[in-house]
């Protein structure tokens, strides 16, 4: 049997691949440490000042994403929220995300140049729930936390938090007031 490809059949095959579930989306992975991650998360040497500088140089915001093994909301974040191409592409395109374990033992160099375990850093930042996103920006010449998202909001509000931070709206208004203003006619 001879296979004869026409431009039309090739175009249809390409379209089918692009429309297939998951096409063009980043992969959700379960790491050896039992934590869900995205293949677009920053491959970090865990020096937060360097990671922040690299994010700024790339024109992106910077966030830490905290999780823990066995966390059902962390799984949901990765299998439902980041499976949504609108959410996933916005976060991937606008933020550099470093993933940390709330109980982890890897050594992290913080913004103040002190090295400590992930667990100790989570304690310093009072991160108690997972998933938690911490967003960082510059104020007074220093890197500081500018917003925090503990747990999961409904998808529209979750995405809105990233847009709020990306817009720098945290300098002028709280998240809820900003959300209300976005919905106003």
Residue ranges and their predicted role:
Residues 129, 137-170:
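Non-catalytic, surface beta->alpha helical segment in thiol-disulfide oxidoreductase systems
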Residues 44-60:
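A short beta-strand-turn-helix
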Residues 118-134:
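Structural micro-motif
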Residues 27-41:
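N-proximal helix/coil linker or "cap" segments that precede and/or mark the start of modular domains
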Residues 58-71:
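Short active-site neighborhood of thiol/selenol oxidoreductases, capturing the structured segment around
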Residues 1-17:
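N-terminal secretory signal peptides and thylakoid transit peptides that target proteins
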Residues 75-90:
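Typically the conserved alpha-helix immediately C-terminal to a functionally engaged Cys/Sec
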């Amino acid at each position: 049997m001879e296979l004869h490809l026409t431009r039309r059949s090739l175009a249809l095959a390409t379209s089918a691949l692009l429309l297939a579930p998951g096409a063009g989306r980043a992969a959700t992975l379960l790491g050896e440490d039992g934590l869900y991650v995205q293949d677009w998360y920053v491959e970090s040497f865990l020096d937060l000042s360097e990671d922040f500088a690299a994010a700024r140089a790339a024109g992106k915001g910077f966030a830490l994403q905290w999780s823990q093994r066995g966390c059902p909301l962390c799984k949901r974040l990765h299998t439902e929220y980041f499976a949504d191409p609108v959410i996933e592409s916005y976060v991937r395109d606008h933020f550099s995300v470093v993933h940390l374990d709330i109980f982890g033992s890897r050594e992290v160099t913080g913004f103040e140049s002190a090295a400590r375990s992930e667990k100790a850093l989570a304690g310093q930042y009072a991160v108690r729930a997972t998933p938690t996103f911490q967003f960082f920006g510059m104020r007074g010449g220093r890197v500081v936390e500018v917003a925090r998202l503990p747990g999961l909001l409904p998808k529209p509000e979750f995405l809105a938090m990233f847009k709020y931070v990306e817009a720098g709206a945290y300098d002028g208004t709280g998240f809820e007031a900003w959300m209300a203003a976005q919905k106003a006619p």
